[in-house]
Every structure is written in structure tokens, then in C-alpha cells.
């Protein structure tokens, strides 16, 4: 690891060599840009205190990025990629200083048509939707932060979100078609990597390659109706949500279940329903919505909010921004002692597990359930439960109780890629880093397998399907 003085000297030399790049050197701005939403976790807040870059650079195009990467490789200076900083695990927070590379200048759609889109990593997901919807297509899955989140950030640090009820997470087969990457070498190479190899760089926090472009398959566009329905009984709300999920003819984009008092944290909405009610937020295609009334009656619910999604989005009032980890954000604005979990239920018995865990914790853990298909296509549920936080020991005990009841934990309170995924070290992901970032300069400290690479059996050619772009002179 470089000393502070060595890093600062390298930054000064690179800045002097590349003065036309957009450099951000003011300490307050560097500190702000070195942050994401890891403050959702009291554990990460403590672990990442004081961690930041030495400087921030915002390349305007691929050529400027190439010059910057080459200089970092020559000087062995760490670099970490930044999208829009909507991640929750400190993905972009530099552990060893160096340069923070703001990718938002690379924000163009490269190709759009025939149900696919290829775009640069720094583009906002909302801008892809805006361009695609008039052509009859929309994103298959996107986070609730779609207005702010970048494509590269979703690819490097995200999972799925709105639309995953149909298409599964981003990593499900068929969603990602290819990625274009740049290596971190004194003479950087540019490669196009088709799926499935492309997924070796997905959710790796930008540790094993620089994502330049992502090619995605799109979904047919629908006119969506956003609904918030309320229930006095949690089991009724769960059964209504599950009935929506398991009705194949009900065209939907999103179904979320929120136990009380979560809906009470929605300060802009809560005058539309009674305090203490459970809620289900859904996006239902206009042509399918007629089914909701009978389902709602059967499960003793009532509708509190109904709005056209297109109109709501133009007013920045979409219910999509009350789902996924936006739910956590709204809750923390009201009660900053809360934190959250990430859980994955069993596709064969998720309704029973959800009810069991809601009853077991009796308000200490508050059910926030997102319904989706898993990567194998099974209808299932994931949780982003809110937790009334007391101590690290109790938080870990709560997570163990879920595990003991056959509910998987994807731990959002840890820094390293593998520790959020049940601790599994993947030699293929490490092999890609060795191929694309041989000096280990990308986001150092986040990929635990890199420190253990000498103990792993690594494929010397992990990207056999990749094609190299011929450099232009």
C-alpha cells in the first residue's frame, strides 16, 4: 500500500501531465463525492469514517479516461469508479485513497433498437427510460433510485428492482447481453465481453474491470397504474400481494409489501390512509387493473392511492420511489435509529416464512418484502426489513435467526463483495481482476479473494469470448 505522501505525489504528477481533465481538488468536495448511502448501516458508518479519495477526476469521454487510467497504471495509483453514489454498502468509498473517477461524463446512448439498448456507464437509468419508452420499450429492471442512479453503478453495485417480478435480477440469463470494458494497464486495452462472461464483472463493486458500456435487453412498454392499497391485518396484505404475484394474467412491474408502521414513515403520503395500516405498493398495467378490485375485496383491503405512472413520474411523485431501498431512506428520515436487512426467502414456502418472521420479531424487525423472480425463474420474495437497531451483537443475532429459519442473508453491513454473498470467494471473478487489473489498483480492499489469489486456482483466460477493440490512432 502506498503512503499518503506517495499517493499525493502521484496525484500531483498525473494532474500536471493531464491538466485539461476536470479535476476536483477542494477537500470538502472530495469528502462529499467519496460518500454513498452506506450511512444506512451503523456498522459501515463506523468502519468507513475518514475514508476518502485524494482527488476526484471527471473524464469527459473515453479518450480522457484512457489517458487517466494509463497514468494511474504507470504510477501504481489506486483508482475507484463513481457513478451517482446511490449504493448502500460503501461500494465507491476508497479504502486506500487514490483517485475517484466520476464516470457521469460518459453518458451517451450508443445504440437503441429492436428491444435492446447499449449505453455508456455514466448515463442515468431515467435517461435510458426516457429515450426507450417512445420506441415501445422500457428497462427490464431498475432500482428505485432510477432518477439518480447510473447504468454502470447498477451494473457494478446493484441487484435488480422494479421489473424483477417479471425478469428476475439483472444477472438473470438474458437481461445483460454484453459489456465493454477497459483494462488498467500502462497501455489500456478495450474489450467487449458477451454474456454470460460479462456477468463476471456484475456486482463486483468495480474491482475487476472498468465498465465503459453495458448492452441490455429491454421489456415491452406498458401504461402503468401505480397503486397503494391498505389493510388492517398483515396476513391479508401478504395474501393480497401474493395473489397479485401469482396471477399470471395480471400484468405487473412491481409488488411490495410493507408492514406497519412503514407506511406511516411516508410523510408525503400518510394523510391518504389511517395510521397503523399495512400497505402493498404495486405497478399494474392499465389493461389488467380490473382484477385488483376483486382481489382487494377478497383480502379485506382498500385502495388509498391510484395514479398513472407516467404523470406521477413527471411530477417526481412516483410510488416507485417508496419501494426497494427508498423505503429505508424514507424511514430513516423519520427515525434515524433504524437500520435494515437483506434477506432471500425460499421460493417453495416464502409466504409461510414471511408470516413466521413477522410474528417472531414482534416489531423489532419490520417486514418490507419485495416480490420477484429469482435467476432460475421461480417466483419468490426478498426482504429489506427494517430493524430497530440496538447493538452490533443483536443485529448479528437477528441475522442468525433468519438463517436458522432457512432464510438467506445478503449482509448489507459488510464492506467486501464476498461477505455480502454468504462469504463465497469466486475464483472466476478474481481471475477476471488478474486479467483486467493485474496490479490490483481498482477499488483496493473490496474484493477479499484478491488477497488470497495465490491460494486459488485461477483460469489464465477467464474471458475467452471477449473481443479486443482495435485502437484508433
What are these regions (language model features)?
Residues 1-70, 86-115, 262-270, 314-335, ...:
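N-terminal flexible segment immediately upstream of the FAD-binding catalytic core
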Residues 14, 72, 240-246, 288-302, ...:
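Short amphipathic alpha-helices in soluble, non-transmembrane regions
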Residues 23-27, 58-59, 79-83, 101-103, ...:
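General beta-strand structural signal in soluble alpha/beta enzymes
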Residues 60, 229-233, 281-287, 342-348, ...:
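Short beta-strand-to-loop capping motifs
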Residues 77, 84, 91-98, 104, ...:
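Conserved glycine-rich FAD pyrophosphate-binding loop
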Residues 110, 125-126, 130-249, 459-466, ...:
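FAD-binding subdomain of flavoenzyme oxidoreductases
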Residues 239-269, 304-324:
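Glycine-rich, acidic
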Residues 261-307:
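A conserved active-site cap/scaffold subdomain adjacent to cofactor or substrate pockets
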